[in-house]
Amino acid sequence: MDHHLLEIIACPICNGKLHFDKKNLELICQTDELAYPISNGIPVLLESHARDLSSLEKK
């Protein structure tokens, strides 16, 4: 994931910072406890496509 892109995109719900999860190829919003998928290198920042973080991932 391009570090410059991570600096300019934000969570569509809270406008908070997103963190790249390299293992799962997702962008994580810790504030809303959501993970957004990356499909073919493109972040899918739609709430309907996000998944809730598990209790282990929230730590």
UniProtKB/Swiss-Prot annotation:
- Record's Gene Ontology CC terms? cytosol
Signal peptide coordinates = none
Mind telling me which PANTHER family this protein's record contains? PROTEIN PREY, MITOCHONDRIAL (PTHR33505:SF4), ZGC:162634 (PTHR33505)
Q: Which family does it belong to?
A: Belongs to the UPF0434 family.
Q: What is this protein called?
A: UPF0434 protein HDEF_0234
Q: Which organism is it from?
A: Hamiltonella defensa subsp. Acyrthosiphon pisum (strain 5AT)
